[in-house]
């Protein structure tokens, strides 16, 4: 009688393992699992003087807070000559512009002719 009891136990553990795997798959598909990062390992951001204190946000709220800068970043970076570096900022400037230096092409109207020495009429050589 001991043998059927152990196979029943193994079937039960296999079922529990499969249920756990299925729930993890569903959570990963929904983006709920934090992939090993916990809030206890993260250091709180330093508070600047004059800023109101806020409570620490969960990872879902952090991603929704960064949506407006990211929404502004995509069309801005696709329509300019330069590019932008996203950053975290206390002052609201979440994008740093990096603009290239453009060299002006030399045109005949803007170039000056070479200077040639003119002989002085009072002092002929």
Curated annotation (Swiss-Prot):
One of its GO terms (cellular component) is SOSS complex. One of its GO terms (biological process) is DNA repair. It holds the Pfam family SOSSC. Residues 44-73, 105-125 are annotated as: Disordered. Belongs to the SOSS-C family. PANTHER family: SOSS COMPLEX SUBUNIT C. This is SOSS complex subunit C homolog B.
């Amino acid at each position: 009688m001991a043998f059927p009891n152990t196979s029943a136990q193994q079937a039960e553990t296999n079922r529990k393992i499969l249920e756990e795997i299925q729930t993890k798959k569903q959570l990963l598909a929904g983006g709920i699992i934090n992939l090993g990062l916990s809030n206890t390992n993260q250091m709180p951001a330093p508070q600047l003087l004059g800023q109101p204190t806020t409570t620490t946000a969960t990872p879902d709220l952090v991603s929704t807070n960064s949506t407006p800068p990211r929404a502004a970043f995509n069309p801005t970076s696709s329509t300019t000559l330069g590019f932008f570096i996203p950053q975290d900022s206390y002052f609201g400037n979440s994008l740093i512009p990096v603009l290239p230096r453009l060299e002006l092409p030399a045109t005949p109207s803007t170039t000056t002719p070479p200077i040639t020495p003119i002989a002085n009429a009072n002092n002929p050589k």
